[in-house]
Amino acid sequence: MNQDSGCEGVGEVVRVMPAVVDVEFAHGGLPDILHALKSEKDYQGKQLVLEVAQHLGDGVVRCVAMGSTDGLSRGDKFINTGSPISVPVGRKTLGRVFDVLGEPIDGVGDVGADVEYHSIHAHAPKLSEQKVATEVLVTGIKVIDLLAPYLKGGKVGLFGGAGVGKTVLIMELISNIARAHKGFSVFAGVGERTREGNDLYREMVESGVINEDEREKSQAVLVYGQMNEPPGARMRVALSALTMAEYFRDAEGQDVLFFVDNVFRFTQSGSEVSALLGRVPSAVGYQPTLASEMGAMQERITSTHKGSITSVQAIYVPADDLTDPAPSTSFLHLDSTTVLSRQISELGIYPAVDPLDSTSQALSVDVVGAEHYEVAREVQRILQTYKSLQDIIAILGMDELSQEDKILVARARKIQRFLSQPFHVAEVFTGNPGVFVSLEDTVRSFKGLVEGQYDDLPEAAFYMVGGIDAAVEKAKALK
């Protein structure tokens, strides 16, 4: 956080609750809402920063703590910085790992004195400055590129319950896209496991996205507020990362990739803070300001005439319920939704993307072309028909189906297995080398499948392969 802000007053702590602190400014200098306060002394070896959330009257402000309040007591002094929390931006941040306050946590040292700092609270670009995305972003993952393609400069949500593969999928997307991407990537770790943050950093170093010898030649910035941190830090870390991404978009005209894992934790931390601030909860116990908080963040993630931000957001779905207010509020802001299904993961098909639930605004003739659109819709039609026949198959068996339906079911099962794919990031666990499948190969492969060109191949040949040529080779090996 910027240390050069001018002081406007000193306050005294009058009440301490977990993650929320009341500070009294008896002699004037009352801070504005969203302004930062810094402690005069250190706690656990570092200054504690508070963000003003409410004015309670009589010179008392209620603040959200950005760090642990252990050791804090009544009477402790806090200085009004006169400005919101600010984080470093620009090329000096590349290859580094930061916390919510923009402090480096990678043990490499400070970012330097000649670094620009920007407030984490900013307005979304005006409508006249925004640009509509129409170019498809190829991910190399068959099920996504075919059925729910991503737009360059668009917003993507990866929805899924616990343990269905959201983080693995987002790491594979980083591996596939960030390597080939010429611009910069910013990753926001919001309330997820510290181990996963460490794994991602190591993965980026190995793939060359982060250069440990010459940091400024790196292509990525990591900002972490993990699940062991107070709710204030988890609530603001996405904004800290977004501020860094906005700088690359606006000041440098870059096409930026912005990854968030996990947006649900952003909502969850807001709910914790809202309860501590004494607000009346709304549906399912969430904060009454859920829609406006989500909107304030999501509206900043957009593409302008200067540059673009393509965002991929992992969104945890509590109890696999997509109607829960947290995931359903996110749906409104997204161009593409990739829904991960527990039923598909139980079949051992990974990535466990639901081909019928996942949607994309890009899946139109105008964007992807007639051939791609027709193949995708035919794949969905076959899978939907198979789904509707499953009850009949379970009760009466395959023999009761017409010959036409039997062929369609066999084709659907092959398509279902062909939607699986070995990942680069999972290679160490599965032993299968990861595969990047081009869009042309994906469309060609599925076109052949829906036309019945590969009806003679066994189902097993289509499981965990890349393109159709690999499936044909596997079928020969199985004979």
UniProtKB/Swiss-Prot annotation:
Reactions it catalyzes: ATP + H2O + 4 H(+)(in) = ADP + phosphate + 5 H(+)(out)
GO cellular component: plasma membrane; proton-transporting ATP synthase complex
UniProt main location, coarse: membrane
Keywords attached to this entry: ATP synthesis, ATP-binding, Cell inner membrane, Cell membrane, CF(1), Hydrogen ion transport, Ion transport, Membrane, Nucleotide-binding, Translocase, Transport
Mode of membrane association: Peripheral membrane protein
Disulfide cross-links: none
The enzyme's E.C. designation: 7.1.2.2
Residues that bind ATP: G160, G161, A162, G163, V164, G165, K166, T167
Localization: Cell inner membrane
One Pfam family this sequence matches: ATP-synt_ab_N
PROSITE patterns for the chain: ATPASE_ALPHA_BETA
GO molecular function, one term: ATP binding
Stated family: Belongs to the ATPase alpha/beta chains family.
Record's function text: Produces ATP from ADP in the presence of a proton gradient across the membrane. The catalytic sites are hosted primarily by the beta subunits.
Quaternary structure (record): F-type ATPases have 2 components, CF(1) - the catalytic core - and CF(0) - the membrane proton channel. CF(1) has five subunits: alpha(3), beta(3), gamma(1), delta(1), epsilon(1). CF(0) has three main subunits: a(1), b(2) and c(9-12). The alpha and beta chains form an alternating ring which encloses part of the gamma chain. CF(1) is attached to CF(0) by a central stalk formed by the gamma and epsilon chains, while a peripheral stalk is formed by the delta and b chains.
Name used for this protein in its record: ATP synthase subunit beta
Gene name of the encoded protein: atpD
